[in-house]
Swiss-Prot record:
The active site is at 148 (acyl-thioester intermediate). The record marks 163 as: Lowers pKa of active site Cys. Monomer. Its EC number is 2.3.1.181. GO terms for molecular function: lipoyl(octanoyl) transferase activity. Belongs to the octanoyltransferase LipM family. GO terms for biological process: lipoate biosynthetic process; protein modification process. The gene is lipM. This is Octanoyltransferase LipM. Pathway: Protein modification; protein lipoylation via endogenous pathway; protein N(6)-(lipoyl)lysine from octanoyl-[acyl-carrier-protein]. Residues 31-246 form the BPL/LPL catalytic domain. Catalyzes the transfer of endogenously produced octanoic acid from octanoyl-acyl-carrier-protein onto the lipoyl domain of GcvH, an intermediate carrier during protein lipoylation.
Amino acid sequence: MEQWRYIVTEAMSPAMNMAVDEAILQLHSEGKVPPTVRFYTWDPATLSIGYFQKAIKEINLEEVQNRGLGFVRRATGGRAVLHDQELTYSVIVSEDHPKMPSSVTEAYKIISLGLLHGFQNLGLSAEMVSLASEEEKEKYNSPGSSACFDSPSWYELVVEGKKVAGSAQTRQKGVILQHGSILLDMDVDLLFSLLHFPSERVKQRMIDSFRQKAVTINEVSSRPISLQESIEAFSKGFASGLEVELTPSTLTDEELALAEELVRTRYATDEWNLRR
């Protein structure tokens, strides 16, 4: 069976987390590292925004700072994500890998099978819903909110009809980077306090809609699920979903050096994080 690399990194700063994902992508494109599945957490808890979001217009940056949270713009699309009581994953693999369909949506589906298996390993009755129809898209979408779990992807992972994972994908240098957030618990009021709304009424409507369409692992689990148990469940999930053997590893010195350079030149700069 084909071997992919499997890495669990210690909690890192928001800039470093995004820089590491990009460093793996770049060095994988150069053939220096194998396809990689990575799990990580954030220190401090962080609000990340999508590549195309307007930071100053959409985000209450003063509140982010007052709460002692980190802030970073991702290289992937999507909306705002609060990385707090959650596990973040990333999958980095060449576009031309035999397991990866050329279609963006189908590649997203293949990678997301790992998530599906992970939720099932935790004893949750998760399912993958195709959002091909406008009716399905509407069911999982909340127009007007900048929060990621309000926005539908092409395939949605749901438990009891509610979204349980938010993912985004980018393709650069012939490599796919898909990363996303697996929620263990969530402070919905905190998330929405970090976003701008035209009025309190609109904000409350978005919160109510969000609660109807998104859910966390520990809200639907019959027992408490820890971070470590989640890592084990999802690592097995990606191995079975992708039909590969995951070999535990660590970041190379070259990856770390490149990531530190990307922190300095991109992910820790206002030019990157506050643009648009």
